[in-house]
């Protein structure tokens, strides 16, 4: 995690309000403010595994990773500090799930960059709480409100489904390509025009669409899917189940929990961390790929054409090839030497 974000710097302008309170941090947490702030107690819920890895070093069991927080974890908290994500639907999903395990009257602080859509917070509350803006700085806004009544949350009501070829894709809010297959993934899938065998790893799997489409076409292909996002993990499991496909779905920070070696590693890797551009995950994906490929195994990824991956592929593998491209995207392939 990086230095404090602008959103956290806005929170710190109000630090005196938190010193005697029991805080719950949640949402799009991009730094370690929760480990530094002065409060009676601090707990953190995150659905991002790599952020949880950073937080548990200091917070231990007071940091929780998962799709939704459990009531036993939030018990005793009297103040919620929520970081607004870039997806409004994800914010609605997360806030409703949090409100369902928090007491009526709890203090709620919602902070986010203005470009994230945080200023529409009141319109998305469905009467659960009323907010007023209490600060604006660093191109961020901070809102305060209180939970006005008990809230019910049914996860089954939040699923979305669509089809790609003959594959059913199930998604939750906050997962990449939640409503339809993105152009980059479609280009990547188009390059697999021959039968596949062996085992395949789909990194940053999102809703599992890449692995599911390839697994449906190649029944002998052994599938492993990984992501850092708890919503992506749940979505991928649901996608495999809907298509009667077997596969291992692993929460992993790139290769952190991946032990096997593969014939194929595929990915449409992210290049954003929240609203910021970040190439760290893809850098790790490429650099460490030879350690997780069998001799002759292939890494095949799709990326925006302007991103600086060719030199890194050559440095790591010795060479690479571009096997498909449009004006916006390129599909790169590199092979581990025997």
UniProtKB/Swiss-Prot annotation:
Pfam families referenced in this protein's UniProt entry, alphabetically: MTS, MTS_N
GO molecular function, one term: 16S rRNA (guanine(1207)-N(2))-methyltransferase activity
GO cellular component entries: cytoplasm
Domain of life: Bacteria
Subcellular location: Cytoplasm
Catalytic activity: guanosine(1207) in 16S rRNA + S-adenosyl-L-methionine = N(2)-methylguanosine(1207) in 16S rRNA + S-adenosyl-L-homocysteine + H(+)
Enzyme Commission code: 2.1.1.172
Annotated keywords: Cytoplasm, Methyltransferase, rRNA processing, S-adenosyl-L-methionine, Transferase
Function: Specifically methylates the guanine in position 1207 of 16S rRNA in the 30S particle.
Family the UniProt entry places it in: Belongs to the methyltransferase superfamily. RsmC family.
Subunit field text: Monomer.
Protein's recorded name: Ribosomal RNA small subunit methyltransferase C
Provenance organism: Photorhabdus laumondii subsp. laumondii (strain DSM 15139 / CIP 105565 / TT01) (Photorhabdus luminescens subsp. laumondii)
Lineage: Bacteria, Pseudomonadati, Pseudomonadota, Gammaproteobacteria, Enterobacterales
């Amino acid at each position: 995690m990086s230095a404090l974000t602008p959103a956290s710097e806005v929170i710190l302008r109000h630090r005196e309000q938190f010193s005697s309170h029991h805080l719950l941090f949640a949402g799009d947490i991009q730094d370690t403010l929760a480990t530094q702030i002065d409060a009676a107690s601090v707990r953190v819920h995150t659905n991002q595994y790599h952020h949880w890895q950073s937080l548990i070093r200091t917070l231990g069991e007071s940091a929780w990773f998962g799709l939704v927080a459990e009531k036993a974890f939030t018990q005793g908290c009297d103040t919620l500090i929520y970081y607004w994500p870039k997806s409004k639907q994800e914010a609605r999903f997360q806030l409703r799930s949090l409100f369902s395990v928090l007491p009526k009257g709890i203090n709620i602080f919602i902070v986010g960059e203005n470009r994230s859509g945080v200023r529409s917070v009141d319109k998305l509350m469905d009467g659960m709480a009323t907010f007023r803006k209490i600060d604006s700085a660093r191109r961020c806004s901070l809102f305060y409100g209180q939970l006005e009544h008990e809230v019910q949350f049914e996860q089954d009501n939040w699923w979305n489904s669509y089809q790609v070829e003959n594959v059913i894709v199930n998604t939750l809010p906050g997962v990449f390509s939640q409503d339809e297959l993105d152009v980059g993934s479609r280009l990547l899938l188009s390059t697999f025009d021959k039968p596949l065998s062996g085992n395949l790893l789909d990194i940053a799997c999102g809703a599992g669409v890449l692995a599911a489409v390839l697994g449906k076409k190649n029944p002998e292909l052994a599938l492993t899917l990984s992501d850092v996002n708890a919503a992506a993990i749940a979505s991928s499991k649901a996608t495999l189940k809907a298509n009667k496909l077997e596969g291992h779905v692993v929460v992993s920070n790139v290769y952190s929990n991946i032990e096997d070696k593969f014939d194929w590693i595929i990915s449409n890797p992210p290049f954003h961390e929240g609203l910021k551009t970040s190439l760290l995950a893809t850098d790790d994906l490429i650099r460490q790929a030879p350690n997780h490929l069998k001799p002759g195994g292939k890494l095949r990824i799709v990326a925006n054409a302007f991103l600086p991956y060719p030199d890194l592929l050559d440095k790591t593998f010795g060479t690479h090839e571009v096997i498909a491209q449009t004006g916006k995207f390129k599909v790169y392939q590199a092979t581990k030497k025997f």
